[in-house]
């Protein structure tokens, strides 16, 4: 393929290795596992002026791109110098030269460097161009894969692990895992602030690009350009367990830092929050399908709810998650990680280590599949059109060890990228909860008004409040134009802890929160432990939004001026404070 063999010739090998020793010295002394998040394989070729490989839309570097170069790659200009350009401010690729220490938790640094090798010609890294494609790579459901496929996947992964012998090989298993560590645990800064690819609209495109290169690296290691990653089909009852190929001890796909209680076919809880709950298997599966319906349909009618909050350059990181990143993405991480035996939930239960478990990529393949599935549901479910999103950039190595810049705008169509998903039924599509636990409307007069309950210092018990809607009896046209959003402002909590709370409408605090398959269940908030390097008190503050138009219809509350809302903490609630709650109408 023409582009994948384009070289970025290294001016000197010496400068490459010396640029690593400072950042990566601890990496060499600790050969423990690293992380798996997306670059691919083969040897460093770097050229001092290889910027001829530019995507079609980038033939003319516009001001936005030039700014990316200055701020992101060269690191020569401070963000303050460029502040007037705030009207066009996509996130640039990270400045590899200033990549620093990643943090496991507050005051605890990752004991090795998560920084990638720095190409010699760092200031002229080209844009990636898709190589010619003969046939689509079809990603299969992991639980249904045959032995021939499993053998190929195991071989590719073991070959990738063997590349760890050279700790600076960007295609090595640990270097691939470290991509996630660097982008997610505070090693990079952009515009003077920490770069974080979770908790915002960067979540889906970053992980799609990460898996794209990871998959191509695996294929190149077994000389199979059609090789495709499997997806963990946790949204279907047949896939609601660790896929067998990952549960064989001694296999390259096995990781011993997993929760041992969740092996051997244990049904996964897509709302898992770090505590074992004695819920019957059928109820867990029912809850799972309910959660999928809520996250894909009810709570994500518009792009902003699905993708997450806007994150242009210069804003604080982690402005807010989209629905799928929140659930089931985060609970699957927590459920898989070994929180009983590992202090920080390693490997899957912490961003810095998640890529060290091969199942990470399988999990994220299904997360990525949800992007495609969501757009198929219809309505206003389409990609964002904001230029700051479309022009945001990341840095990856391809399977030939060539460094590239990639843009969000180039990953919106999986087929154009050369891959697709083997179809599986999606039973959650028709799993709208209709069972009601409340006949009629709950008496809101007997429930404290929102202004008396908030600000709330700690969510250490279930609380109920009544809240007034901005408009009632809305017409179909009004609903199509604007979504009704239940908004929790300044939800603050310790970001080193697991957090989950559930939200119900039209019930009081006697609600049975273990059964989610009911019309009153509105949604949940979750958080995986993570840290911001410059955040010494480790308190994160987010805005949590739930789309409730469909819920109001299903509960017969469309004509009501005031409704009841109940919050039920599941874990970490004693550390959660909420400043205020309101209902807003937002353009879809």
Swiss-Prot record:
Transit peptide: 1-88
Reaction catalysis annotation: 2 catechol + O2 = 2 1,2-benzoquinone + 2 H2O
Cross-link (2'-(S-cysteinyl)-histidine (Cys-His)): 184-198
GO molecular-function term, one example from the UniProt record: catechol oxidase activity
InterPro entries referenced in this protein's UniProt entry, alphabetically: Di-copper_centre_dom_sf, Polyphenol_oxidase, Polyphenol_oxidase_C, Polyphenol_oxidase_cen, Tyrosinase/Hemocyanin, Tyrosinase_Cu-bd
Lineage, broadest ranks: Eukaryota, Viridiplantae, Streptophyta, Embryophyta, Tracheophyta
GO biological process terms on file: pigment biosynthetic process
Localization per Swiss-Prot or TrEMBL: Plastid, Chloroplast thylakoid lumen
Keyword DNA repair in record: no
Protein family: Belongs to the tyrosinase family.
Sites where the protein binds Cu cation A: 180, 198, 207
Required co-factors: Cu(2+)
An annotated GO cellular component: chloroplast thylakoid lumen
Record has Aminoacyl-tRNA synthetase as a keyword: no
Organism field: Solanum tuberosum
This enzyme's EC code(s): 1.10.3.1
UniProt keywords, alphabetically: Chloroplast, Copper, Disulfide bond, Metal-binding, Oxidoreductase, Plastid, Thioether bond, Thylakoid, Transit peptide
Binding annotation for Cu cation B: 329, 333, 364
Name of the protein: Catechol oxidase B, chloroplastic
Described purpose of this protein according to its UniProt entry: Catalyzes the oxidation of mono- and o-diphenols to o-diquinones.
Predominant location category: plastid
Intrachain S-S bonds: 99-115, 114-181
Top EC class, one word: oxidoreductase
Textual note on the cofactor: Binds 2 copper ions per subunit.
Entry-linked Pfam families: PPO1_DWL, PPO1_KFDV, Tyrosinase
